[in-house]
Amino acid sequence: MHPPAESDPVRANERLSWAREALADPALDLVRASTDAGFRSYWRTLDHEPSRIVMDSPPDKEDVHPWLRIRALLEAGGVRVPHVLAQDIEHGFLLLEDLGADTFLQVIGDANADDLLDAAVTQLLKLQAIAPPADLPAYDEALLARELRLFDEWFLGRHLGMALDCGDLETLDLVYRRLVDAALAQPQVLVHRDFMPRNLMPVAGGAAVLDFQDAVRGPIAYDPLSLFKDAFLSWPQARVDGWLDRYHARALDAGLPVPSLPRFRRDADWIGVQRHLKVIGIFARLHHRDGKPKYLADVPRFFAYLDGVLPRYPELAPLAALIDGKVKPAIARITEAARG
């Protein structure tokens, strides 16, 4: 199953008709505002004041109920999320306030990063203070392991064409087990799962949070690590360390169950390895299954993150050896082959 093409005339007609009715504006037109890695898309009103956003979630592909549920949960906890002005759940249309055209990813830079990320942490601390509902999915052993397997299935197997021998599989099993155990041992809180600059909007008074529908109960270090070691831009390690320390101090002040700073730093490193491997696999899947090759350009960023962490932990040395000995040579081969 592939995401819809850029132009689906039937769906476009339904979307426009609904927006015109919701806003009582028969002359209204829409222009694409953004899309995501799935099937959801966002459309901005043209020549309508104030500007609004239509979120289009085709019901057979993107159930809008989780988005609405988590939005309400976050709003009740004081997190700044988009306001819903109208909705048609049956057809998957929501009318939202327009928070602007730029996310943190578009506006962040060396000069303003400290202030922007501090605003992001303000929202994150509110999010993590919310008690996860009893029926919220957990970042449990099965989910953590399933995500890790995306790396060997989609990146090593499908993208690189690597045939893993018994020793390779044992290495991955061993390291994956250690990563999963470490994640489960962390204090568990509400986790956004993609708390990063492209899912944060600059608004008056701070930041607004987007793309929260996949929230789970999971490791406390997951979201701050995702924020400071982003999928689409990198920062010097010294700066990342400073932000992690600042988050830790603020989390302590907020009464969140963070461990000691050295333990938190280790937890962030280890859950980062899990996330980096997962995202490498997802980016390969987006290319090969969903026809979205642009994400592959950011894969080297994640190997750089791994290079910075794996050598510090002897328990993760088998993974470092596999990456250096087999994965990087395979990447070099396909890169050379692609150049012709």
What are these regions (language model features)?
Residues 1-93, 189, 203-208, 323-340:
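Conserved NTP-binding catalytic cores of kinases and kinase-like/nucleotidyltransferase enzymes
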Residues 3, 281-340:
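ATP/Mg2+ or Mg2+-diphosphate-binding catalytic cores
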Residues 10, 14-15, 21, 132-138, ...:
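An alpha-helical support segment within catalytic cores of ATP-dependent transferases
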Residues 32, 39-46, 54, 93-94, ...:
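Active-site acidic catalytic loop and adjacent metal/ATP-binding pocket
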Residues 34, 40-144, 149-150, 156-161, ...:
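ATP-binding pocket architecture of kinase catalytic cores
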Residues 113, 140, 164-168, 266, ...:
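Residue-level recognition of alpha-helical structural elements
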Residues 116, 187, 192, 216-217, ...:
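Secondary-structure capping and boundary motifs in well-ordered enzyme cores
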Residues 152-159, 220-257, 270-290, 302-309:
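Active-site activation/catalytic loop segments of kinase-like enzymes and analogous catalytic loops
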